[in-house]
Amino acid sequence: MSDLSGEDVTVVGGGIGGLSAACYLADAGADVSLLEKNEQLGGRASRLEVDGFRFDMGPSWYLMPDVFERFFAYFGKEPRDYYDLQRLDPHYRIFFKDGDQIDVTGDNDEMAQKFEEYEPGAGEAFEEYLSTSERHYETAMNKFVYQDRSELRDWVDLDVMTAAPVGLQLIGTMQSHVEDYFEHPKLQQIMQYTLVFLGGSPRTTPALYNMMSHVDFNLGVYYPDGGVGAVVDGLVELGEELGVTYETDAEVEEISRRKEGFLVETVHGDTTHPDEVVVNADYAHAERELLPDHERQYDDDYWDDKTYAPSAFLMYMGVEGDVEPLEHHTLVLPTDWDPHFDDIFDEPAWPDDPAYYLCVPSKTDDSVAPDGHSNLFVLVPIAPGLHDGDEIRQEYREKVLADIADNTGVDLRDRIVYEKQFAVSDFGERYNATEGTALGLAHTLRQTALLRPNNRSSAVDGLYFTGSFTTPGIGVPMCLISGEHTAEALIEDIA
């Protein structure tokens, strides 16, 4: 990247995208200061530490290790310089609510045999699907993800046109794409559930994201010792080595253009006057609440018409004893999950028969719980904007704990020694998340690639955005790349 010596840049928000952008900009020579609303850095990748338990409050899956390796390699580093990784086996366990159970492992020959047991011919279809997924992953990452193509003109390129057949082939939905390979509903669920973590439904997520199966089965699922919070610590440490300064408990309430540079003011009345600003706060919140009306790119109708990724009902729990047979990552899936997706995306309601996720990091890491105890959280995807008052939370808590006992055999109810709930209103309060989304903008057909909000402001020179609302999208790896894209855009404009 070009030399930014003498440029003063303020990054508003210390999520993964902001931490990433700060590193790239500081490496290019800019004086970078980062302001974070909350008491710790990491954004949704916050940590909760209490009574000897340590919880990752947000992301808990370490996927796409190649993205992290690429990020650190840019600075002459490796992930292991900052944290240690363990590859999980099994990757995760699935309990189906009809009593069936399957472990998803890193042995694809074994998985092909398991698929064959469910459906004749599915083993061969699984191998073909993964081969296709790998090709699409390599093409998508090299042509569409690592390269920022946020403008229509960026797609009129020989390399892109050469890769276009992949995009055309995958212009349908994940549901129709997976159904072309597998008829058994359980196999379809296995290949589609990770879409929830991209903020979408199989019925609306582009088939492009079949590449996530390559991520899942081929690249593997890892755990950073200490949790995803250790990755945040690594990004912050790298930033400090590059000269980034960080300030927490510094919520920004105004960003406005001045004749020379910007005014950035916090709720405490502290001001900075940078040359450029990178916003990692919730994009819609920043436009609606932090910028003057004449410096906004989009009106309220634009944001009101967007499809936001699910929120979540979370319970962080410290419990006595172990929680066998739960694995580090466990999914519990109903026989028919369409009603749950309807409750998220079509007719918002608390799901009556939910699909949900359990994370038990103490299965892998003794440091996250006191001796003789287990650390776990349960995550139920729910509609953004849903009312989540105390009464409905308590009622739903009882439903979920009973469901866990019925479908996994693990009854937690008499063993909980610590519990904290987190849901829609908490996402809104802690992260200024629009409609309490847990993730950002959903990856729908109308909100993918250049159809996502741009990382350059079209209304104000010198103002940029990074994170899960812009390209390339949702997830820790994508936000790392988003930080790179945003830094490149700023540098291109200054050079």
From Swiss-Prot:
Instruction: Tell me the lineage of the source organism.
Output: Archaea, Methanobacteriati, Methanobacteriota, Stenosarchaea group, Halobacteria
Coiled-coil residue windows: none
Q: Which GO terms describe its molecular function?
A: oxidoreductase activity, acting on the CH-CH group of donors
| Pathway the protein takes part in | Carotenoid biosynthesis
Q: What class of enzyme is it?
A: oxidoreductase
Gene3D superfamilies per record? FAD/NAD(P)-binding domain
**Keywords recorded for this protein, A-Z:** Carotenoid biosynthesis, Oxidoreductase
The record's Gene Ontology biological-process terms are: carotenoid biosynthetic process
Q: What does this protein do?
A: Involved in the biosynthesis of the acyclic C50 carotenoid bacterioruberin (BR).
Per the record, the similarity remark reads: Belongs to the carotenoid/retinoid oxidoreductase family.
User: Catalysed reaction(s)?
Assistant: dihydroisopentenyldehydrorhodopin + A = isopentenyldehydrorhodopin + AH2; dihydrobisanhydrobacterioruberin + A = bisanhydrobacterioruberin + AH2
Q: Is Oxidoreductase among the key words of this record?
A: yes
Report the EC code(s) recorded for this entry: 1.3.99.37
Phenotype on disruption: Cells lacking this gene accumulate DH-IDR and DH-BABR.
Q: Tell me the PANTHER family matching this sequence.
A: PHYTOENE DESATURASE
Protein name, per record: Carotenoid 3,4-desaturase
Can you name the source organism?
A: Haloarcula japonica (strain ATCC 49778 / DSM 6131 / JCM 7785 / NBRC 101032 / NCIMB 13157 / TR-1)
